[in-house]
Swiss-Prot record:
The keyword RNA-binding applies. GO terms for cellular component: cytosol. The gene is smpB. GO terms for biological process: trans-translation. GO terms for molecular function: RNA binding. This is SsrA-binding protein. The keyword Cell membrane does not apply.
């Protein structure tokens, strides 16, 4: 008999920005490439990257990601990169123009949501986001708590345990 192939996650997430999903309401998502140096890719493959407090901007028709922390490569030498440098995002012209219009219209921003490899290339999931107010965050927490309790009660009923 032939050996079965292992089910492999096609796009394993390297880093995700959970804080962004808590602080912002994500309206739309985009996949884009990113221009990196060799030592940056090596550091990312080691799992050393932080999306916290990073954001994207559009300047002079080009998309840039700022405050993306990629620590220096541990086995690098004088060729190491600057950890907090601004990096260029790769998007089609139509996407950049569309995002520029949406960001300029209202109180929206571009937030990186996750980093993952796709066919050997690093991709950034970029979200068009709108900031949440404190009461919105509290409502979300309350809604999640209620959903969790409903699931818990259903589990008890299925198991025959009455509360």
């Amino acid at each position: 008999m032939a050996k079965k192939k292992k089910a492999k996650n096609s796009n394993p997430v390297i880093a995700s920005n959970r804080k962004a999903r808590h602080d912002y309401k994500i309206l739309d998502t985009f996949e884009c490439g990113i221009v990196l140096l060799g030592t940056e890719i090596k550091s990312i493959r080691e799992g050393k990257v932080s999306l916290t407090d990073s954001f994207a901007t559009i300047d002079e028709g080009e998309a840039w990601i700022r405050n993306l922390n990629i620590p220096i490569y541990s086995r690098g030498s004088w060729t190491n990169h600057s950890p907090m440098r601004t990096r260029k995002l790769l998007l089609h012209r139509r996407e950049i123009d569309s995002l520029m219009g949406k960001v300029r219209d209202g109180n929206k921003t571009l937030v990186p949501l996750s980093l993952y490899f796709k066919e050997g290339r690093l991709k950034v999931e970029l979200g068009l986001a709108q900031g949440k107010q404190d009461y919105d965050k509290r409502q979300d927490i309350k809604r999640r708590t209620e959903e969790r309790e409903v699931v818990r009660d259903l589990g008890r009923r299925v198991k025959g345990i009455h509360a």
